[in-house]
Amino acid sequence: MFTLKKSLLLLFFLGTINLSLCEQERNADEEERRDDSDKRDVEVEKRFLSTLLNVASKVVPTLFCKITKKC
């Protein structure tokens, strides 16, 4: 009976440690996800600005040509 209690106590202790480690890992993952959304916003902003610059580089010369009528 004593050895059974000892074994159960050991299993309970190891399970508690395991759950604690999983919780810490889960918290770290949540923090990473929060940081990732900021990085994604920056990446989207960079893509948007580069697309806008590409369009502007094609449209501005055409507009300048039509306004000055020196085509």
From Swiss-Prot:
Record localization: Secreted
A single BP term in Gene Ontology: killing of cells of another organism
Keywords (A to Z) from UniProt: Amphibian defense peptide, Antibiotic, Antimicrobial, Cleavage on pair of basic residues, Cytolysis, Disulfide bond, Fungicide, Hemolysis, Secreted, Signal
Domain of life: Eukaryota
Record InterPro entries: Antimicrobial_frog_1, Frog_antimicrobial_propeptide
Cleaved propeptide residues: 23-45
Keyword Metal-binding: no
Stretch forming the signal peptide: 1-22
One Gene Ontology cellular component annotation held by this UniProt entry: extracellular region
Residue stretches spanning the membrane: none
Protein name: Brevinin-1CG4
Organism this protein belongs to: Amolops chunganensis (Chungan torrent frog)
